[in-house]
């Protein structure tokens, strides 16, 4: 089962993300399944997947929000078309979070309207198999699932239909300091029936390249006010991934008591199965 975060301000919940027992190999993953093997030849490549088909798969496990329905009026969509903010930009360091810790973004910054979400990582390099990590976003409704395939924001679908989210592109190498990939979010333009924005990082072609998050010793997510560039919070992950190939880093979600306010929870939960597994549990057909 996948449950939404508890109300902002509560203590950490280590069972926030739990692997569904009905998914083979998830509740009791084989510890040998993702062990590192020698890297494949450098000329072994496979095409990147395109945008998933329009028909979502059958219902997958999802959490429920016990909250009043959000306002029904549609916000006017925001527009993005600017280049990403400078790598590592932002004023101050913000609040340093630990796993499962939550923070009310609206209380920390009452005038907050637009977010810069920066994600970064360092990797253990292997000469013949360079890493390619991808940041993705799932826009979830109250049932814990995407409403439509277009609610899956990634390198081949960079902007949400309501214009509220813009992915600034795929960094194929992860080289350099600061943010490796950046996502812009206009909170005022997020559709009223979207309650959660899940930010995750996955490894591209993990089986082919014999790679996993145990080879990514440092990763982070930071949340900043895009208009003032002030950093609100940051979560640094330390050896959270093990032999897994997908990681939910954090989540921005509406306050159950006041849907106009937003909070953030540092999740830091990794899974086997890569991007396809995340798509399965959030209702995106990525086959």
UniProtKB/Swiss-Prot annotation:
Keywords: cAMP, cAMP-binding, Nucleotide-binding, Nucleus, Repeat. Pfam families: TerD. Belongs to the CAPAB/TerDEXZ family. One of its GO terms (molecular function) is cAMP binding. GO terms for biological process: mRNA splicing, via spliceosome; nuclear mRNA surveillance of spliceosomal pre-mRNA splicing; protein splicing; spliceosomal snRNP assembly. Residues 16-35 have a biased composition (Polar residues). C- repeats lie at residues 60-68, 75-83. InterPro entries: Stress/Tellurium_Resist (IPR051324), TerD (IPR003325). Residues 1-94 are annotated as: Disordered. The lineage of its organism: Eukaryota, Amoebozoa, Evosea, Eumycetozoa, Dictyostelia. CDD domains: TerD_like. Signal peptide: none annotated. This is cAMP-binding protein 2. The gene is capB. Possibly a heterodimer of p31 and p34. p31/p34 could also associate with CABP1A/CABP1B to form an active complex. GO terms for cellular component: spliceosomal snRNP complex.
